[in-house]
From Swiss-Prot:
Cysteine pairings via disulfide bonds: C61-C77, C186-C203, C212-C236
CDD domains: Tryp_SPc
Organism per entry: Drosophila erecta
Protein name (record): Trypsin theta
Keyword Signal part of the UniProt annotation: yes
Cellular compartment(s): Secreted, Extracellular space
GO biological process, one term: proteolysis
Gene: thetaTry
Any single GO CC term annotated in Swiss-Prot or TrEMBL for this entry: extracellular region
Amino acid sequence: MHGLVVLLVCLAVGSAFAGTIGVSNADPFEREGRIVGGEDTTIRAHPYQVSLQNKKGSHFCGGSLINEDTVVTAAHCLVGKKIAKVFVRLGSTLYNEGGIVVAVRALTYNADYSSKTMENDVGILKLAEKVKETDDIRYIELATETPPTGTTAVVTGWGSKCYFWCMTLPKTLQAVYVNIVDWKTCASDEYKYGEVIYDTMVCAYEKKKDACQGDSGGPLAIGNTLVGIVSWGYACASNLLPGVYSDVPALRKWILNASQTL
C-alpha cells in the first residue's frame, strides 16, 4: 500500500481525469483500496479485525485473523514489504495503542495478482507466535458462497473518513454497513465500472458510505464470516461506483492452501 500522502495525490489525479478518459481507462494505481459515512465501533464487535503496521506503529492496511497464526489481507498491501518491518496489532479498538502487537514470520500473496487489473488481490501473513482467542480477539470464518446482491454486510477499518481532504486516519475503529453487489451486476450498466470488474471480485454499495484509503486489506463481513477483502475503488463513496473487494469464496482455495503451506 502506498503511503497515505502519496495515495491521496494519486486518488486526486484519478478523480480529476475520470470524467474525461472514462473509468475503464484510468491508471490502476489511481484506484487503490479505499470508511466514509461510518461510525465509531469497538474491536469487541469486530474481534477479527487487525491493523498491519510498520516498525514505528503506523497503520498502513487492515487484515482479518482466520486462525491462531494467519491473517488475510490484500496482495497490494504486501507487495515490496519486508517481513522484519511488518507487525500486526490485534485486540484493540485503537490502531496506535492497546491489544497486542505480534511480529510476522512469513508473508505471501497470490501469484496471479495483477496490479493492473487488481484481480486475485489477496495475501496472507503468518504470525511469529500463535494467538489465542479472547473477548477482543477472534478468528473469522471464510465464506464458501458469495452472498446474493442486496445482502447487508459490514466493512471495518481505520481508513480515512473522507476522500482526499482528510489528511489523518481516525484512531478509533470505524464501521459502515453496505449492500453486496455481485460481480456481474457490478460490471453491468447499472453501475459505472463496466469491464474492469472480474470474477474474483465482489462489490458493496450504499450511497455516501464506503471504505476509503487506509482500509485496504480489511474485512467485509456478515456476522462471523469473511465475504470480502477491501481492494480498490474510484474515490470513496462515489455515486454508482461501489467499493470493490476481493471475493473470498472465489479465492478461498488459495487462502487455505497458502495458510497450510507457508
